[in-house]
Amino acid sequence: MLMLFGGSFNPPHIGHRIIAEIAYDEFNPDRFLIVPSKNPPHKSIDFIANFDKRYSWCERVFFEHYFEVSDIENKLPSPSYTIRTIEYLSNFDKNINLLIGEDSLKNFHKWYKWEEILKKVKLVVYPRYFEEKNSYSVDFDYVKLESPIVEISSTYIRQRIKKGKTVKGLIDDKIFEEVLKEYS
């Protein structure tokens, strides 16, 4: 089984790391892919560090042998639609789990070709907010990852840096100085 954990990782932070570790421990996938988006369709390109930088950060944050940081979305057409990544990966592995946050689940029905995604993967959802399943506009079949709610976001980190506030402990030391420089 392949676990796919995609995102802008703008920047990758301790919350991403915690979620990935728990998902790996819980599901023990054959492969665990960390996939930074090249050009996420729902994000403004003005606020995103370039792909090579985010890819490099992910390589240093997710350094264990059981994580594999993939540049696949850098090779696929833009924008970086999840379905394109899944279709490419399904050439090699038909058993794909897609790891997403509960906040993404709420708007999943707005994703490009979301119904096709559901036919090709099993959704694994990590908790982000205290919301009931029935608050989603579409009923999805998914597995909920048993993990603590990690309320750290890349947006929060970027905002703190812009205000000159500390983000110590929220970002891996291996990328700390680069992240500060990028978003200051």
Curated annotation (Swiss-Prot):
UniProt record, GO biological process: NAD biosynthetic process
A single GO molecular function term of this UniProt record: ATP binding
Keywords on record: ATP-binding, NAD, Nucleotide-binding, Nucleotidyltransferase, Pyridine nucleotide biosynthesis, Transferase
Record-listed E.C. numbers: 2.7.7.18
Pathway given in the UniProt record: Cofactor biosynthesis; NAD(+) biosynthesis; deamido-NAD(+) from nicotinate D-ribonucleotide: step 1/1
A Pfam family hit: CTP_transf_like
Reaction(s) this enzyme catalyzes, per UniProt: nicotinate beta-D-ribonucleotide + ATP + H(+) = deamido-NAD(+) + diphosphate
Superkingdom of origin: Bacteria
InterPro entries, A to Z: Cyt_trans-like, NadD/NMNAT, Rossmann-like_a/b/a_fold
Role according to the record: Catalyzes the reversible adenylation of nicotinate mononucleotide (NaMN) to nicotinic acid adenine dinucleotide (NaAD).
NCBIfam families (UniProt xref): nicotinate (nicotinamide) nucleotide adenylyltransferase
Family: Belongs to the NadD family.
Name of the protein: Probable nicotinate-nucleotide adenylyltransferase
